[in-house]
């Protein structure tokens, strides 16, 4: 990893006095200096411009490694080169003080136990490479000053075909600069965080089983860097806090993730989004969280989280992958823009399924089950819009937009099916909505005065209660809403259009290019004629819907004081 630093201070550790006096152990044999070109992480501000430039991969290094001789309290490495540890360290550590030189350490079927600090401590080096051979174990009881079983002040790259079992009373692996992992099998049990790369994290491969009281993976340099990229690997992560907690941008383009955060979706979130408190007052238990942006280009991701499954204080972009989410709060949440360009998304459980300041669906296969809204274009952080009714500050905000341009969408919501606190546009795709059975919500909802619900293409079938049901305000293809005098269950047909709702319904909204203007159609439920409608206008309403307070009949859905949108 390229580093422009010319000097590094040799700050002494606070390890045990025995370890400090162990310096000076003789190193036998011929020292082979490895010529290493650093690994440079190049992250752009926009997530679609993520790139990583790598120099010489550590796995291509050649030459014989020098075998380390273990002293009473461990080993100290003071110059660059390749070193191999084949002997257990029962009470001590490996310390690297090599100034600006590159150092590679090979762990070959060893165990290191240190009750007074890290098992491996890199105080100074240009780049530190750790190769795993065979089965290796690190056990560390450390302090807040050196808070990882592996603690490196400089860039670190870990690779190899071996395994590493880490037990730590604080963090598992800590890199204060850039941290890259290209392979290996990791089992980490940490009372706080599993793996921390302050400046950046890049994972291209490996198998990870992480149990952490804090976060699973974490970056923390909020002033300059803090990005993370995952291109491969298999991850099983169980955390007391967030599964992935990235201070800047997160990109996932490959890998298989199984993340359980907090107590999982079986526990309803009680943090600020419910109580209106500051998030610092309670622990975050999100599955995947990034302060700036989350971008998913590929991979298979399964999240079971107490709080949001996906969360960004900025934007969320889904370009591909297979994503399965269960959440005690939101399935996906972006304070700003949430864009879905492809992939398969299945939100099996959530309070609100997919939420963002703006939501744009261009493609993808999406299924959402939510106890409140399925899609909610509301915006703002969870901390600014509490769950308590009447606290919503986004009603009638034309900057909040839900747009569906393509894809296949299914929503089963107990609240509003598709909800925008501003405008709602459907221009393509196929959208099915099983909306609420209660009359306090509707299959479709959009903002107050000045906002619109416009249909210019695609297929929409939305069913649910009639109390807050709304039709489109404008359309370029034939659209009809039928409100019935009583509730029905069972399959419906309307001309060539058919659908089998999952629950009872009293309102049916259909927009499709299969409907012909001027034609008469009969709504059939369970093969029984229920109601005939002649489509004399592009937008037709048959039957009576309820109205929300202060609004004209059928103009809007949802209640202004009826909970967060």
Identify the function of each model-found stretch.
Residues 2-565:
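A composition-driven surface/loop motif
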């Amino acid at each position: 990893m390229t580093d422009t630093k010319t000097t590094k201070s040799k700050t002494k550790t606070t390890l045990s006095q025995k370890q400090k006096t162990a310096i000076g152990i003789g190193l036998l044999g011929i020292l082979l200096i490895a010529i290493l070109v650093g690994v440079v992480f190049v992250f752009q501000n926009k997530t679609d411009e993520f790139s990583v430039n790598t120099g010489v991969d550590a796995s291509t290094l050649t030459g014989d490694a020098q075998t380390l001789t273990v002293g009473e309290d461990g080993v100290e490495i003071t110059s660059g080169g390749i070193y191999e540890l084949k002997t257990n360290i029962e009470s001590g550590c490996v310390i690297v003080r090599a100034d600006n030189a590159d150092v590679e350490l090979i762990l070959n079927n060893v165990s290191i136990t240190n009750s007074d600090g890290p098992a491996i401590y890199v105080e100074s080096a240009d780049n530190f490479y750790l190769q795993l051979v065979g089965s290796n174990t690190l056990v560390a009881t450390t302090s807040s000053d050196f808070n990882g079983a592996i603690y490196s002040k400089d860039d670190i790259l870990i690779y190899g075909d071996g395994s590493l079992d880490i037990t730590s009373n604080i963090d598992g692996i800590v890199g204060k600069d850039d941290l890259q992992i290209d392979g290996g099998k990791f089992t980490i049990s940490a009372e706080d965080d599993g793996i921390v790369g302050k400046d950046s994290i890049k994972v291209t491969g490996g198998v990870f089983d992480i149990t952490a009281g804090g976060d699973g993976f974490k970056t923390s340099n909020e002033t300059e860097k803090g990005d993370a990229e995952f291109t491969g690997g298999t991850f099983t992560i169980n955390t007391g806090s967030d599964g992935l907690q990235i201070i800047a941008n997160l990109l996932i383009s490959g890998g298989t993730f199984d993340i359980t955060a907090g107590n999982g979706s079986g526990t309803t979130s009680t943090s600020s989004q419910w109580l209106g408190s500051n998030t610092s007052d309670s622990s975050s238990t999100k599955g995947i969280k990034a302060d700036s942006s989350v971008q998913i280009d590929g991979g298979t991701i399964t999240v079971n989280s107490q709080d949001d499954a996906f969360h960004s204080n900025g934007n969320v972009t889904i370009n591909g992958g297979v994503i399965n989410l269960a959440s005690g709060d939101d399935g996906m949440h972006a304070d700003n823009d949430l864009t879905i360009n492809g992939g398969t998304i299945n939100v099996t459980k959530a309070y609100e399924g997919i939420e963002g300041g703006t939501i744009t669906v261009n493609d993808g296969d999406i299924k959402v089950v939510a106890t409140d809204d399925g899609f909610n274009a509301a915006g703002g952080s969870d901390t600014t819009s509490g769950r308590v009714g009447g606290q919503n500050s986004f009603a009638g905000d034309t900057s909040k937009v839900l747009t569906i341009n393509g894809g296949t969408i299914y929503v089963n919501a107990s609240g509003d099916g598709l909800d925008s606190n501003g405008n709602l546009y459907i221009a393509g795709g196929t959208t099915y909505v099983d909306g609420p059975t209660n009359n306090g919500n509707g299959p479709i909802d959009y903002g107050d005065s000045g906002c619109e619900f416009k249909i210019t293409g695609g297929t929409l079938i939305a069913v649910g209660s009639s109390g807050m049901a709304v039709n489109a305000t404008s359309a370029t293809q034939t659209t009809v809403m039928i409100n019935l005098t009583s509730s029905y269950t069972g399959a419906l047909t309307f001309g060539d259009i058919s659908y089998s709702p999952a629950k009872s319904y009293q309102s049916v909204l259909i927009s499709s290019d299969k409907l012909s203007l001027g034609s008469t159609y009969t709504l059939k439920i369970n093969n029984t004629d229920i109601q005939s409608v002649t489509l004399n206008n592009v937008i037709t309403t048959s039957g009576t819907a309820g109205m929300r307070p202060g609004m004209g009949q059928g103009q809007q859905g949802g209640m202004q004081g009826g909970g967060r949108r």
